[in-house]
Amino acid sequence: MDSVLRQSKAVCPFMKKATASSLRAMTTAARPAASPCGGAISKLQVLAHRCPVMGKAMAVQSARTGGRASAAPASFVHKAKLHTGRPREAQAVEGVFTGQKAGLPPHPPVKPTTATAANPSPAACTVSGNFGTKFNYEKFYENELEKKHKDKSYRYFNNINRLAKDFPRAHMATKEEKVAVWCANDYLGMGRNKHVLEAMHTTLDEYGAGAGGTRNISGHNKHAVELENSLAKLHATDAALVFSSCYVANDATLATLGSKLPDCVILSDSLNHASMIQGIRHSGAKKIIFKHNDVEDLEKKLAALPLHIPKIIAFESVYSMCGSIGPIEKFCDLAEKYGAITFNDEVHAVGMYGPHGAGVAEHLDWEAHQRGETKGTIADRIDIYSGTLGKAYGCVGGYIAGSAKLVDTIRSLAPGFIFTTTLPPAVMAGARAAIEYQMSYDGDRRLQQLHTRAVKEALADRDIPVIPNPSHIIPILVGNAELAKKASDKLLNDHQIYVQSINYPTVPVGQERLRITPTPGHTKQFRDHLVAALDSIWTELGIKRTSDWAAEGGFIGVGEAEAEPVAPLWTDEQLGIADAVAELRAQASDEKKGVINQLLESVALEQEREALNAAEEVADAAKAAAASA
């Protein structure tokens, strides 16, 4: 620097008069506030631009480099750092699903010319002028979609319009095309429950369509407060917080906690939902994957971590694609032993399990919760619940529930909550009505469980392979993406039955399936129609039956000779059918027909829908009596 200054002072009259220290000061000083120049320049550069000699030289230099400079990324001053913008990302998962590592779909190799066009070097992207061609965005989209078509994982949407007055039927593009829907997540038919609809109609008429803003600005209202109070009551927690969906609830909560807790490590079940995986990734926290429902594997990973660092064990209670149920009590034991907190996603369980519909954690201590004794139960040991206002509750939205300080932390820090318009008042009123209804009446979930058992029995009689599980999910194994799609299409086109095929990436390649979800409305005529159609299609397409899988040694629980029978989570005693089942079995009745199918045909349960409607009338009367009191 000193040698440059000496040379400059010998040439420039201005610099001859200036001292070396003043010149150095001008090179580090910021430009004047009124300077019109772009970028950060020194006072010396400003003066040089005014010089008749240096000004011309700098103009030439600026013209030569201007193209590259204008294409360079802009530098933003005072850029806010959100927790989702951390430079460190969660470690990538090798296989989200069991067996995924060896089961990726075979994508066609990309030709070198295609790779060059689709993945240009950074220089090619930033240099303007005649330095290559512009990026072909439409071609990129086309290539990505072509991959999906070739590996048979491209998704087609069916036009399904569910009919509130003809549940569980729907019409397709035209009202004349009626189909029976067997794969909806409105598990209990609450989307057409009269109490829910009345609450929504009344609220809509009085308060209008939208909430009018975020919770912080104009969108906080009595409907949100009442709904969150009902959710906190459901889970016996201090507080709850409502989100626009459970995807957002999971993403926002895990991202916020993982980024804010110092040196946090999140231990995640290998089959966790995409929303949880995304939230962990957004958190930037270290992520450790443990084998699905494997308590021993989880403990090994916990034991290897320092006791003092924050840890979150993230899992689901019911896994929607296979129907398995998490070992919640054992996870709580490990959390307490190793200083972790638990994050329990009850999305597919709320409304479906437990005396009050609070989920699997409540169901595991049935008698205690029936008595209202929640202290010390498994449910009481959970730190964070997440759940949905859709599915069993028939509306839309998601939530978390937990301690008051936890909920307030997420409320105050999570962008996914802060910057989203509040759910419409009518939706929140309907969701609250559904929650309160299911807390006081268990007839829907009991009938749903009976219908689930009946379908599983009937499919077993036809040698149709159901992946064993203790829940309300009925995953029928196909094992081939193309066959799964064909089976779904034939059900729809030939039998007017809608069951969506489930392919990669939702499930691993080779484990493609049809997923059936019975409801209280799927009575005998619907069941018989479904089972006969599946039997016919399995024969027509040559899809493997349970005996075929058994001949090959079994696969993911289907046809495995030494596999233990899987008992339903709902016991006969909890369903109130223990005596009737014992009597039927003692009579040595028709085993091929299945005990539950016989039970549903018996005099006691012959009028299923009438009994359900009568129970609703009783609930109405109780509600009216409570209001008058």
Swiss-Prot record:
Which Gene3D superfamilies does the record cross-reference, listed alphabetically? Aspartate Aminotransferase, domain 1, Type I PLP-dependent aspartate aminotransferase-like (Major domain)
> Transit peptide: which range?
1-69
Tell me which NCBIfam families the record gives: 5aminolev_synth
Report one GO cellular component: mitochondrial matrix
The family this protein is said to belong to:
Belongs to the class-II pyridoxal-phosphate-dependent aminotransferase family.
This chain's protein is named: 5-aminolevulinate synthase, mitochondrial
Protein's organism: Neurospora crassa (strain ATCC 24698 / 74-OR23-1A / CBS 708.71 / DSM 1257 / FGSC 987)
What does this chain do?
Catalyzes the synthesis of 5-aminolevulinate (ALA) from succinyl-CoA and glycine, the first and rate-limiting step in heme biosynthesis.
Point out residues bearing the modification N6-(pyridoxal phosphate)lysine. Answer: K391
Q: Where are the catalytic residues? A: K391
InterPro entries xref list? 4pyrrol_synth_NH2levulA_synth, Aminotrans_II_pyridoxalP_BS, Aminotransferase_I/II_large, AON_synthase_class-II, PyrdxlP-dep_Trfase, PyrdxlP-dep_Trfase_major, PyrdxlP-dep_Trfase_small
Gene Ontology terms for molecular function: 5-aminolevulinate synthase activity; pyridoxal phosphate binding
Supply the alphabetized keyword list. Answer: Acyltransferase, Heme biosynthesis, Mitochondrion, Pyridoxal phosphate, Transferase, Transit peptide
Gene Ontology biological process terms, A to Z: heme biosynthetic process; positive regulation of organelle assembly; protoporphyrinogen IX biosynthetic process
Keyword check for Mitochondrion: yes
